[in-house]
Amino acid sequence: MFVVKMVLGFLILLSPLCATGLDISQTDIIERSLNFLLFVGILWYFSAKKLRSFLRSKSLEISKRLEEIQAQLKVSKENKKKLLKELEQAKEKAELIVSDANKEAYMITQKYELQTKMDVENLIKNSKALMDLEVKKIKRELVESVFKDLRESKKVSFNAQDCVNILKQRL
């Protein structure tokens, strides 16, 4: 079929030469053309099967490679979707961790503020208690020294009951 198409095509190309009215009787164009067509036909006859099988194998290789690439593309798209999903989950988890850390930091701050406040109050109470104790101690020492001075001076006489009453009133 191909050979017939070639011959027809060749004749169509030669038809303008025939219509010009040139004298081509002295040329061997027809013999050369027939030899060329015969050569192409024989070449086609012997190489057509090999050429077809070669082209088929190449097209099969190309289609296999295309299928492999499409499979890889599909896997890549699935991996991309999976990784994007994991990224979103990681972002949500990070936001949750940050919010929990902020809450925990606030709670720890409140705890330490409360503990510090209690410690300060305890220190104030303890210092007041120590001051009261020191005041009582100083009063007692003062009263004792005054009584001692009064007893040693012997200008004033006290009995034991009077000393007890004075001490009860002052301390």
Swiss-Prot record:
Residue stretches spanning the membrane: 2-22
A molecular-function term among this protein's GO annotations: proton-transporting ATP synthase activity, rotational mechanism
InterPro entries reported for this sequence: ATP_synth_B-like_membr_sf, ATP_synth_b/b'su_bac/chlpt
Keywords noted in UniProt: ATP synthesis, Cell inner membrane, Cell membrane, CF(0), Hydrogen ion transport, Ion transport, Membrane, Transmembrane, Transmembrane helix, Transport
Subcellular location: Cell inner membrane
Function text: F(1)F(0) ATP synthase produces ATP from ADP in the presence of a proton or sodium gradient. F-type ATPases consist of two structural domains, F(1) containing the extramembraneous catalytic core and F(0) containing the membrane proton channel, linked together by a central stalk and a peripheral stalk. During catalysis, ATP synthesis in the catalytic domain of F(1) is coupled via a rotary mechanism of the central stalk subunits to proton translocation.
NCBIfam families in UniProt: PRK08475.1
Assembly: F-type ATPases have 2 components, F(1) - the catalytic core - and F(0) - the membrane proton channel. F(1) has five subunits: alpha(3), beta(3), gamma(1), delta(1), epsilon(1). F(0) has three main subunits: a(1), b(2) and c(10-14). The alpha and beta chains form an alternating ring which encloses part of the gamma chain. F(1) is attached to F(0) by a central stalk formed by the gamma and epsilon chains, while a peripheral stalk is formed by the delta and b chains.
Protein's UniProt name: ATP synthase subunit b
Species whose genome carries this gene: Helicobacter pylori (strain ATCC 700392 / 26695)
